[in-house]
Every structure is written in structure tokens, then in C-alpha cells.
Amino acid sequence: MIHGIGIDIVDIRKIKKIITHSGDKLATRILSKSEWKIYKNKKHPVHFLAKRFAAKEAVSKAFGTGINQGVTFNQIEIFNDKLGKPMLHLFSCTALLANKLSLKKMHITLSDTNSYACAFVILER
């Protein structure tokens, strides 16, 4: 049974502008430690950050809580399996909320163009 669906789209130019004005503040706020290491070594870090931001917003929408209602950016991690498929890993309060809601499966897909990054998430019980 589907618990929630979330989608988000991010203007990559806005993320680039934020990075230009405030450095890595946004990245340190939203990325997990593992994601941070990848971000710092990416050829196109702006696209990476935009996709992670969109993904985490989509997760919060699928939970039905939004950010800061038991779901926080750095407690959601997006990684790729050995075939490159994006996967979700939850930590701390966000993981506890998923357990409380009896979530069994989490699905995510990411996409980007030169201008936009998009994420779509389905959470199942």
C-alpha cells in the first residue's frame, strides 16, 4: 500500500547562485557525511547538490510532513547501488518515523537537464 508520493523540481541556476553567494553552507546543511565526500569530488557539484536537494524535498513530501517535522535533510541519504540505481537510506529521527509509519519500501528516481533537477519518491507500507 502506498503511504505517500513526493515530487520536487529545482532550478539548478538558483542552486548555483546560492553556492556563489554562500559557499558550501547549503551543502553542509543538506548532505550526509557520505554525500559530502562525493559532492567535494564531483566534476559538476552544482548538479549533484540540486538533485540531492530535490530528492530530500520529495522524500519529505512523500512522508507528508515536510522538512523539520521529524524529517531533516541530513538524515536522508541518497546513494547508488552497483548498477547506478538511486536508493534511499534514512537515519535518526527520520528512520524512527519511517519505522513508526511501518514503511517497508522506498522508491526514488532522479533526473536532470542543464537547467533543472527533478526527483520522484514513493513510500510503501
UniProtKB/Swiss-Prot annotation:
Source lineage: Bacteria, Pseudomonadati, Pseudomonadota, Gammaproteobacteria, Enterobacterales
UniProt source species: Blochmanniella pennsylvanica (strain BPEN)
Which InterPro entries does this UniProt record tie to the protein? 4-PPantetheinyl_Trfase_dom, 4-PPantetheinyl_Trfase_dom_sf, ACPS, Ppantetheine-prot_Trfase_dom
Q: Does Metal-binding count among this protein's keywords?
A: yes
List, alphabetically, the SUPFAM superfamilies matched: 4'-phosphopantetheinyl transferase
Recorded protein name is Holo-[acyl-carrier-protein] synthase
Transmembrane ranges, per UniProt, are none
Say what the protein does: Transfers the 4'-phosphopantetheine moiety from coenzyme A to a Ser of acyl-carrier-protein.
Question: Which molecular-function annotations from GO does this UniProt entry contain?
Answer: holo-[acyl-carrier-protein] synthase activity; magnesium ion binding
